[in-house]
Swiss-Prot record:
Gene: tyrA
A single GO cellular-component term on record: cytoplasm
One GO molecular-function entry: NAD+ binding
Organism (species): Escherichia coli (strain K12)
Superkingdom, taxonomy of origin: Bacteria
Subcellular localization, as worded in the UniProt entry: Cytoplasm
Pfam name, any one: PDH_C
Chain segments annotated as coiled-coil in the UniProt record: none
Catalyses which reaction(s): chorismate = prephenate; prephenate + NAD(+) = 3-(4-hydroxyphenyl)pyruvate + CO2 + NADH
The name this protein goes by in its record: T-protein
Chain ranges of the Chorismate mutase domain: 1-90
One example of a Gene Ontology biological process annotation: tyrosine biosynthetic process
Domain Prephenate/arogenate dehydrogenase: 99-361
Enzyme nomenclature, EC number: 5.4.99.5, 1.3.1.12
Length: 373
């Protein structure tokens, strides 16, 4: 029996080696694709091509008796690696005549990411940090674009301190709140103004499929090429007004981050044994715990800035606190029917999204369980 099992495992090892060779060949082809895309200014990520390819492979897998979900999982991971590989090949310069780009706060993580992407796209990039302010006027004197990438709590102050910029210079900010910085830029500069909010962390290996929110400030025709450049990097663009952006971010960022902070604080005050929690956890709780831990591995100043960026955020968090208290009253009263009625009400509000989110989360939970050690 042992000999038979060993022989079968040896065959599996040979198949795995063949898979490795095929993956290496695929990455070589991806590198060639990256060079062609770079030459012609084509975006890294083309959703129609990806969807068509996955649909074809799923059908072919089913015909071979291979679970379609398996080949999709494998291909999605391979494509993620492919997008990163294409990144390294550089990108077409969509605005060759652009004068130097100055990134204010370019030493920070997001600033470094934009420096990398702009450099890969053939633009000259300069960095303006705190210790450079005595030379700021010289650094920005001939700038074609100035990108402000500094902590939220000093963004408007830094914008106000900028020396006069060339009239055609594009002034951009990357803050995760938009209305205040956008208004500050419109006051500080008479030329083109653009507000951006990258909806991802600076540790992303690629901008493929990442969302970049943009808010029009002034003279969109002057910065249209830059939006197209970001699309070439693989990102999805979403336009919204600065006011609407901040209203949505109150839910997406401020409330979510505060709830995560409060839960982490509660765990610490209760002094629970994390190792035991992990050992006993279901995939969904492990994933939730990972999201909580991830928050506390990052810069507390950033999250304090996001959560405390407006009175509206505080008002929203207070309403959440009030509803939390109302939910606790149901428990105190032991009113299961009221709980079920509230549950059904929320289920109805989610509508078809509930089933969609269940399907999406199922994939995430399987991946989380696969990574369990």
């Amino acid at each position: 029996m042992v000999a038979e099992l060993t022989a079968l495992r040896d065959q599996i090892d040979e198949v795995d080696k063949a898979l490795l060779n095929l993956l290496a060949k695929r990455l070589e082809l991806v590198a060639e694709v990256g060079e062609v895309k770079s030459r012609f200014g084509l975006p890294i990520y083309v959703p129609e091509r990806e969807a068509s390819m996955l649909a074809s492979r799923r059908a072919e897998a089913e015909a071979l008796g291979v679970p379609p979900d398996l080949i999709e999982d494998v291909l999605r991971r391979v494509m993620r690696e492919s997008y990163s590989s294409e990144n390294d090949k550089g990108f077409k310069t969509l605005c060759p005549s652009l004068r130097p780009v100055v990134i204010v706060g370019g030493g920070g993580q997001m600033g470094r990411l934009f420096e990398k992407m702009l450099t890969l796209s053939g633009y000259q990039v300069r960095i303006l940090e705190q210790h450079d302010w005595d030379r700021a006027a010289d650094i920005v004197a001939d700038a074609g674009m100035v990108i402000v990438s500094v902590p939220i709590h000093v963004t408007e102050q830094v914008i106000g301190k900028l020396p006069p910029l060339p009239k055609d210079c594009i002034l951009v900010d990357l803050a995760s709140v938009k209305n205040g910085p956008l208004q500050a830029m419109l006051v500080a500069h008479d030329g083109p103004v653009l507000g951006l909010h990258p909806m991802f962390g600076p540790d992303s290996g690629s901008l493929a499929k990442q969302v970049v929110v943009w808010c029009d400030g002034r003279k969109p025709e002057a910065y249209q090429w830059f939006l197209e450049q970001i699309q070439v990097w693989g990102a999805r663009l979403h336009r919204i007004s600065a006011v609407e952006h901040d209203q949505n971010m109150a839910f997406i960022q401020a409330l979510r981050h505060f709830a995560t902070f409060a839960y982490g604080l509660h765990l610490a005050e209760e002094n629970v044994q994390l190792e035991q929690l992990l050992a006993l956890s279901s995939p969904i709780y492990r994933l939730e715990l990972a999201m909580v831990g991830r928050l506390f591995a990052q810069d507390p100043q950033l999250y304090a800035d996001i959560i405390m960026s407006s009175e509206r955020n505080l008002a929203l968090i207070k309403r959440y606190y009030k509803r939390f208290g109302e939910a606790i009253e149901l428990l105190e009263q032991g009113d299961k029917q009221a709980f079920i009625d509230s549950f059904r009400k929320v289920e109805h509000w989610f509508g078809d999204y509930a089933q969609r989110f269940q399907s999406e989360s199922r994939v995430l939970l399987r991946q989380a369980n696969d990574n369990r050690q």
